[in-house]
């Protein structure tokens, strides 16, 4: 009504969204409190204005407005209080976190500053100390003075910088030369050559130092120029075959010593060694095998046993050697020439069989060949013969290698290779590292004297302190304890501050913040609840869902609940429909067997009632479930399942097409694979399906035959029971008697009640006549004849047909409407006929 006035304060979707967002965290809760407070203040102001306007209308509900105004004011105060408390807790937590981070940063910063400051100094001192220690080892081994040691050290530092080799590498090379017996000052002068050859050949510095010593001291190759020529020959010779210099560097000192023992020295000895190893490597499996073969040959040549063996074989070894040496051959080459002539006397058949056995690795066959051809009398092992045969086959290559190693091109190999190596980034990086290391040595050398003096000064003090500590242990314990206490208190103070912050203050603040947050959320919840709104939507927003999404989701769940309620009602309707259906199905069996019919009717009633009750119970359960889903957020999972099932039903066509495409791909892939193996996939599955159907049909046929036999047996038993027990031989005659009884009973009943029906009809006619007379009297009192009234007035017919249409297809509904209209039309016609007949009777009587 117009006089009724009602104002409801509803905190709607905006406040709901703010409340939902506030649940995501403390910071968002604080922001949500601010927004809600602003909204509440605005609502409070509008409510006050509404109260002011309502004062002018006494009929309006001022008391209700006042109550809402007060409640909203209290809610605003609570929200503001919670907002202030939460802001304070957050500020406290931020301050504690900043304090903790500041303390940790100070400690880490102090440590990092100390480490960063000390790292280069410590590195420089360590580098200088390491170089000084290596240099001192060389000086001690070579009996050098301090000045000589310093000069050699400077020479090695310059060599390291010039050749891009590290200081430690140069120290190792020079130390190897000195340890081998070379003069320390001379070894220091060889540092530049060592570094340059190491960079050019990429060989190990220790192996190169051994080569320098063997060249200089063993072969007598003196001077830097001669040594450089020797390395040029060796480096160039290593490129003439498959045996590089860095691979043969370890074996060269041994080979040079063996050649020097045979009287072969100088550049020729080195040339013959390199050329022999290159040729021997062609017939050997590896470089080590080639070295072994040459070693055995050198130990065999010129031995007394070898000379005697040749003498027994009819060869004057010494005379032949003298002639060959006089002809320009070395003793090594002369021994090879003598042996080659001896092998050639055995023919080419020996060499073919020897090579065939060697290719198979059959040493036993080679030994038998030595015995059969008489070689075992001269040569004691297989390695000797292998070297001899390799040199015999590659003698021309051996001579050419010697010539090439002495050419002008070969004598510039080290410089050319060094220039090419120096262009590499790795060498440039090594040069950079060497420069840094040299700087460290320079800085460290400047600090080492002071540090050494300091340590020398402190050491006696430490000794006196040790003596004093031994004499006064109690005082030492006190001093150490005091110092430890001071440091410990400093550390403990920092640690306690950090620990108090982390383990006490921060957790307490977190707990207080959590409690404040919970209180703020509860205040928001009460404000939200007081403002109204959907309960289910409110619950969803409490768990962090947005206002719009929560409202939509609640509406979806409500519709789902309504759908379940509809399912429940449908189940009830189905239950009611199934009751007569069940009864009808059961009644179809009534007929020939009356006793069984009565039992069937009883069973139908029982089953029908239980079925209806069960369906009604299921319907109520579904109805309850729908209501629960509408009101309880726990039903989200069930609703999600139902929605998923509906979506599958709704979009079954694209889903079926998608999985049909996958199945087609799988079938195509398997058909291709099985087709490659010769297996027909469709035929295989067709055979499998035919076997399956055949088994199913056979099983059904067998079971159907058994069921048919059972029914026949059951019918025979029932017939026999009726015939024997009840004495019914002919059921048709029994039912004829039943029909006679029914007709006779109907006749008796009609005869008994005919008088009652006649009296009722007479009474009805009397009442109709009395009513007609009363109507004529009323018409006469009105001043007009009854007939005139009837004749002069029109006929007013109120016809309101009611048509009940069951659900179904459009054609079915149309047919039902037509049938209803036809029935209603016949009723209308009958009613009009009765009306006209009554009118004629009244007119006639008038």
Curated annotation (Swiss-Prot):
Any one Gene Ontology BP term: viral tail assembly
InterPro entries assigned to the protein according to its UniProt record, in alphabetical order: Phage_tape_meas
Coiled-coil region(s): 59-82
Keyword Glycoprotein: no
Tagged with keyword Nucleotidyltransferase: no
Entries under PANTHER family matching the protein: FELS-2 PROPHAGE PROTEIN
Family, per entry: Belongs to the P2likevirus tape measure protein family.
Reported function: Serves as a base for tail tube protein polymerization and acts as a template for tail length determination.
Protein name, entry field: Probable tape measure protein
């Amino acid at each position: 009504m117009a006089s009724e006035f009602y104002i409801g304060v509803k905190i709607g979707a905006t406040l709901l969204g703010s409340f939902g967002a506030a649940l995501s965290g403390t910071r968002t809760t604080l922001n949500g409190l601010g927004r809600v407070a602003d909204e509440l203040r605005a609502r409070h102001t509008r409510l006050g204005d509404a109260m002011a306007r309502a004062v002018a209308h006494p009929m309006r509900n001022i008391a209700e407005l006042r109550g809402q105004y007060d409640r909203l004011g209290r809610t605003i105060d609570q929200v503001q209080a919670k907002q202030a408390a939460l802001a304070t807790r957050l500020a406290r937590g931020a301050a504690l976190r900043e304090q903790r981070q500041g303390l940790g940063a100070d400690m880490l910063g102090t440590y990092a500053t100390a480490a960063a400051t000390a790292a280069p100094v410590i590195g420089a001192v360590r580098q200088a100390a390491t170089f000084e220690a290596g240099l001192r080892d060389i000086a001690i081994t070579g009996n050098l003075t301090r000045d000589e040691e310093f000069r050699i050290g400077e020479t090695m530092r310059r060599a390291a910088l010039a050749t891009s080799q590290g200081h430690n590498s140069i120290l190792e090379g020079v130390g190897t030369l000195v340890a081998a017996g070379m003069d320390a000052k001379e070894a220091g002068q060889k540092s530049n050559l060592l570094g340059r050859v190491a960079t050019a050949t990429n060989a190990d510095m220790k192996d190169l130092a051994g080569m320098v010593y063997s060249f200089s001291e063993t072969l007598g190759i003196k001077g830097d120029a001669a040594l450089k020529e020797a390395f040029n020959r060796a480096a160039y010779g290593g490129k003439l075959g498959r045996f590089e210099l860095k691979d043969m560097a370890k074996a060269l000192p041994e080979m040079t010593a063996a050649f020097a023992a045979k009287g072969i020295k100088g550049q020729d000895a080195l040339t013959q060694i390199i050329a022999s190893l290159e040729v021997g490597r062609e017939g050997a499996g590896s470089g080590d095998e080639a070295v072994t073969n040459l070693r055995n040959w050198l130990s065999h040549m010129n031995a007394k046993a070898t000379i005697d063996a040749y003498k027994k074989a009819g060869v004057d070894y010494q005379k032949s050697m003298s002639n060959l040496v006089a002809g320009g051959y070395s003793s090594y080459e002369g021994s090879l020439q003598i042996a080659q002539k001896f092998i050639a006397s055995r023919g080419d058949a020996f060499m073919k069989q020897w090579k065939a056995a060697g290719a198979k690795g059959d040493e036993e066959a080679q030994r038998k060949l030595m015995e059969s051809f008489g070689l075992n009398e001269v040569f004691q092992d297989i390695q000797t013969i292998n070297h001899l045969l390799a040199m015999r086959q590659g003698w021309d290559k051996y001579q050419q290698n010697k010539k090439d190693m002495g050419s002008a091109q070969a004598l510039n190999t080290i410089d050319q290779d060094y220039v090419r190596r120096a262009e590499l980034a790795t060498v440039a990086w090594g040069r950079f590292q060497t420069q840094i290391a040299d700087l460290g040595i320079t800085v460290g050398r400047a600090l080492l004297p002071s540090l050494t003096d300091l340590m020398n000064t402190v050491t006696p003090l430490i000794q006196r302190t040790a003596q004093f500590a031994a004499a006064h242990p109690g005082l030492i314990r006190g001093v150490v304890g005091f110092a430890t206490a001071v440091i410990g208190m400093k550390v403990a103070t920092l640690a306690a501050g950090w620990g108090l912050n982390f383990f006490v203050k921060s957790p307490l603040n977190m707990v207080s913040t959590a409690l404040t947050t919970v209180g703020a959320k509860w205040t928001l919840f009460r404000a939200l609840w007081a403002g109204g709104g959907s309960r289910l939507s409110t619950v969803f927003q409490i768990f962090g869902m947005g206002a719009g999404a929560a409202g939509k989701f609640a509406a979806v769940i409500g519709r789902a609940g309504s759908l379940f309620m509809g399912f429940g009602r449908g189940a009830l309707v189905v239950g009611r429909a199934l009751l007569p259906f069940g009864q009808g199905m059961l009644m179809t069996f009534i007929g020939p067997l009356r006793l069984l019919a009565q039992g069937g009717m009883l069973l139908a009633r029982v089953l029908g009632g239980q079925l209806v009750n069960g369906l009604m119970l299921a319907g109520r359960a579904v109805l309850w479930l729908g209501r629960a889903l509408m009101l309880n957020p726990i039903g989200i999972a069930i609703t999600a399942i139902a929605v998923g099932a509906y979506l599958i039903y709704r979009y079954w066509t694209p889903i079926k097409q998608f999985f049909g495409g996958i199945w087609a791909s799988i079938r195509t892939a398997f058909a291709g694979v099985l087709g490659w193996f010769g297996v027909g996939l469709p035929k295989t599955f067709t055979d499998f399906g035919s076997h399956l159907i055949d088994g199913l049909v056979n099983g059904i046929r067998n079971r159907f035959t058994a069921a048919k036999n059972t029914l026949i047996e059951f019918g025979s038993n029932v017939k026999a029971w009726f015939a024997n027990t009840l004495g019914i031989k002919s059921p048709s005659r029994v039912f004829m008697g039943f029909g006679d009884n029914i007709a006779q009973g109907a006749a008796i009943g009609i005869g008994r009640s005919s008088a009652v029906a006649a009296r009722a009809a007479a009474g009805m006619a009397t009442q109709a006549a009395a009513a007609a007379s009363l109507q004529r009297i009323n018409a006469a009192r009105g001043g007009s004849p009854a007939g005139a009234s009837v004749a002069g007035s029109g006929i007013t017919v109120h016809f309101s047909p009611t048509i009940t249409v069951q659900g179904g297809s459009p054609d079915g509904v149309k047919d039902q409407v037509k049938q209803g209209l036809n029935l209603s039309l016949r009723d209308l016609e009958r009613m009009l006929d009765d009306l006209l007949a009554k009118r004629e009777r009244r007119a006639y009587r008038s």
